[in-house]
């Protein structure tokens, strides 16, 4: 008797933090060349995929004001469907927990989970390299989530090397203001000539003197970024908070001795509308075991 195909699959999509973000150049086509360390964290969305008999991609509970053309999980499903030239259907239900426009990579992670999940659900047998190449068409951060491990990332996001990081806790604050990435990278005052560093250079001092080249521009465009940085600095003196990605979320590495009750009280005292969470670093994407490297 032949094995019945799997009918549904649920994946957790982790957010990420940029422990630093340097812009080291710009290509003739306008794309910026970056260096960063991407840290996976346990702030997750949930992607549920279900086979349907119709030959279509169906999204239930869509995000308000996000069209199917902009919806990364829909685009990811259609992309892999077209690439493999298959007549199969899927219903996608996305439960959002990671704030949108926060610099935490939630949309890219959801797209990666959709590609990984459909590769399993539809028995496509695509390897990690193929999935990553498809993911890059959706966004520069998608290949990292398909790679599935903490990484030193270069180029436009496609050069990814595994990096070993200690398990740490972080305080992450989102001041509830999305910053369009394009507004950061098109700004004439953005630093574009940061001297490149090496993995060893980062590991020699992973917690101190790490900066985000997008932060100064983001603070000018979005005053809430500076407000959030100041709030964390006052709440946790000496924590050296910085922005993640192109903003507007900021984060600080927590001292293991920080009292949990103090942290809970801090989160209760956040300015109205802000979102805060204490998160734990992850070593791997929860979907890592579904990804074939062959």
Curated annotation (Swiss-Prot):
Pathways per UniProt: Isoprenoid biosynthesis; isopentenyl diphosphate biosynthesis via DXP pathway; isopentenyl diphosphate from 1-deoxy-D-xylulose 5-phosphate: step 3/6
EC number: 2.7.1.148
Alphabetized Gene3D superfamilies for the sequence: 3.30.230.10, GHMP kinase, C-terminal domain
Entry-linked Pfam families: GHMP_kinases_C (PF08544), GHMP_kinases_N (PF00288)
InterPro entries (alphabetical): GHMP_kinase_C_dom, GHMP_kinase_C_sf, GHMP_kinase_N_dom, IspE, Ribosomal_Su5_D2-typ_SF, Ribsml_uS5_D2-typ_fold_subgr
Protein's GO biological process: isopentenyl diphosphate biosynthetic process, methylerythritol 4-phosphate pathway; terpenoid biosynthetic process
Enzyme's top EC category: transferase
Residues binding ATP, per UniProt: 99-109
Catalytic activity: 4-CDP-2-C-methyl-D-erythritol + ATP = 4-CDP-2-C-methyl-D-erythritol 2-phosphate + ADP + H(+)
Family label: Belongs to the GHMP kinase family. IspE subfamily.
Main function: Catalyzes the phosphorylation of the position 2 hydroxy group of 4-diphosphocytidyl-2C-methyl-D-erythritol.
PANTHER family named in the record: 4-DIPHOSPHOCYTIDYL-2-C-METHYL-D-ERYTHRITOL KINASE, CHLOROPLASTIC
HAMAP family per UniProt: IspE (MF_00061)
Name of the protein in question: 4-diphosphocytidyl-2-C-methyl-D-erythritol kinase
